[in-house]
Amino acid sequence: MARYRHSRSRSRSRYRRRRRRRSRYRSRRRRYRGRRRRRSRRGRRRRGYSCRRYSRRRRRRY
């Protein structure tokens, strides 16, 4: 009985953690995407650095 209870609590905690992590990552990604689009447009006009290279570096990190 003790063994069953332990495994059950373990699986439940893992599921909860995974769910929370996933939602947080999704929200952060969406916010980052919107901010990046606005910033890249403004930066391209002001500075003359290549946007393609910058985006590639960011993508690799994610």
Swiss-Prot record:
GO cellular component terms, A-Z: nucleosome; nucleus
Cytoplasm is among the record's keywords: no
Tissue expression notes: Testis.
GO MF, one annotated term: DNA binding
Keyword flag Nucleus: yes
Function comment: Protamines substitute for histones in the chromatin of sperm during the haploid phase of spermatogenesis. They compact sperm DNA into a highly condensed, stable and inactive complex.
Name recorded for this polypeptide: Sperm protamine P1
